[in-house]
Amino acid sequence: MALENLLHPTNIKIDEYAKNATKFSFEALERGVGYTLGFALKQTMLYSIAGACVTSIKINDGKVTSLEDVIPCDETVADIILNVKSLSVTLAEDVETGTITFELSGSEEEIFSEEAKLSEGLAITEEVFICSYNGGKKLKIEAKVEKGVGFRPAQDNFKDGEFLLDATFSPVVFCDFEIKDARVGRRTDLDKLELNIKTNGNVNCEEALRLAATKIQNQLRNIVDIEEINKGIFVEDPKDINPILLKHVEELNLTARSSNCLKAVNIRLIGELVQKTENELLKAPNFGKKSLTEIKDKLSELGLSLGTLIENWPQDL
């Protein structure tokens, strides 16, 4: 069968059935292609998308050395570790590690993640309950945050005063797929791919899918002989793009808060920014309506707007 005669999915559905959870369906695909794409996308999302997470925890400057130690709160040491580990975090593009610190003293109170002291470039994207502090004795909890890709098992349980944790860096917390039968005309030997994705909120499901597809595409570029199937490939040429879109977002002269929000979600170029919708930006850590209004005004001065589709945008800039 000639390459140009292969079916491509024309019926694409997106069902955001819960917060940070979306089901995508693609039909119709040639028999076997559904499984090939589904498996590749699943593995890439779970193990090849970069992110940040808590990798170690120190309590009372390393004086708490066992899960059985008594601390001044209703929760056990193990409970504290699990609660802090569950934090969804991001690090700015130019920051590799960060620290989350809780210093508790005084009267009893319930402690949530919003009360943490954060190192520069670090953000917590969702509120999480940490502990019920009983008051009296001081309690200090320090968590180290690192960037990484995929899964990294802890080499030890406890070392140098720190509880070491298995690290799951990918913002995709669940991904699975199912292949169903599809039909086009008289052909019934086709695939329908249903892809179910859940994220921790640091990226939305559509962005996670786009990142995975782009990574696979870039890997295949090194394998495919361009000359042989040139008719079926569109090669993006930066010369065909408005040069303003290739400029860095710093040239918009945004406030520090807005700039840091864009860095946190890895938006570097104006062209990357204009392809985002208002809703996508508002989901970014610490991004509010003031930042949104500022960005819209700056783009308007250049004759640009959010939600713009750039068909020939290069994926490898």
Curated annotation (Swiss-Prot):
Instruction: Report any one BP term from Gene Ontology.
Output: DNA-templated transcription
Annotated region Alpha C-terminal domain (alpha-CTD): the residues are 241-317
Query: What stretches pass through the bilayer?
Result: none
Q: Which Pfam families match?
A: RNA_pol_A_bac, RNA_pol_A_CTD, RNA_pol_L
Q: Which Gene3D superfamilies match?
A: 5' to 3' exonuclease, C-terminal subdomain, DNA-directed RNA polymerase, insert domain, RNA polymerase, RBP11-like subunit
How are the domains described in the entry? The N-terminal domain is essential for RNAP assembly and basal transcription, whereas the C-terminal domain is involved in interaction with transcriptional regulators and with upstream promoter elements.
Task: Give the family from UniProt.
Answer: Belongs to the RNA polymerase alpha chain family.
The protein here is known as DNA-directed RNA polymerase subunit alpha 2
